Design a protein with these regions (language model features):
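Exposed, interaction-prone regions of secreted/extracellular proteins
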Residues: 1-205
Length: 205
């Protein structure tokens, strides 16, 4: 894979049924290259976190990018709210598997950011897949439980290969998120050639 793009609406995350007060829950939306069957992931998106506490509910939204196995880079001065429309394009530099560019935009308020990024030492991009993902974001080896998010959609799910083959969601396979008992808590579905739906199917145990 050489590039991947999409746009999506930032979900309104809620604590799942049985949520523990004082514990953060996450619904992170992102697109990327690699990760399924490869040790690297080049990715960017927005993390939606939510926590119940004694005085109510606290939320935070943080745009980010990451070239795993290096850690997450949080993007500052990039305002985002639930319900905003985000768009992202990730492009590998021509003839390279260690450098790329990331373009992230909040189409609702006009905020935008771009980054020229370099692979972590010893890492190369395999380019074996493009991804459109909703999950609980792993942050520095810590993985919060999944927040309840209802349903959300990735639109304009397009990608391309180094030999200029154009691909989209119609060429993709779906993967579901399971709890520790094997129950589906987040389900993916391909709605059409460029539209992917993610649906919360909790609650968590």
């Amino acid at each position: 894979m050489k590039w991947v793009e999409s746009e999506w609406t930032v979900p309104n995350a809620f604590p799942p049924p049985g949520a523990i007060p004082g514990v953060w829950y996450s619904a992170s939306t992102w697109i990327g290259i690699d990760g399924d069957g490869s040790p690297d992931v080049l990715q960017a998106g927005c993390d939606s976190d939510v926590m119940n506490f004694i005085f109510g509910t606290m939320r935070q939204l943080n745009p980010w990018w990451e070239w795993f196995p290096e850690g997450t880079f949080w993007i500052s001065n990039f305002p985002v709210s639930q319900g905003d429309t985000m768009s992202c394009l990730i492009c590998v530099d021509e003839g390279s598997n260690t450098s790329a560019r990331i373009y992230l935009m909040n189409d609702t308020n006009g905020a935008h950011a771009s980054f020229a990024v370099t692979a972590p030492s010893g890492t190369t991009l395999e380019g074996n897949c493009a991804e459109w993902i909703l999950e609980s974001l792993e942050i520095d080896t810590s993985v919060p439980e999944l927040a309840s998010y209802g349903a959300m959609y990735f639109d304009a799910c397009n990608s391309g290969t180094t030999d200029n083959t154009f691909l989209n969601a119609g060429n993709a396979n779906t993967m579901n998120m399971l709890d520790s008992n094997g129950n589906v808590i987040s389900e993916g579905a391909i709605e059409n050639q460029t539209l992917v739906r993610c649906t919360y199917e909790g609650p968590l145990p």
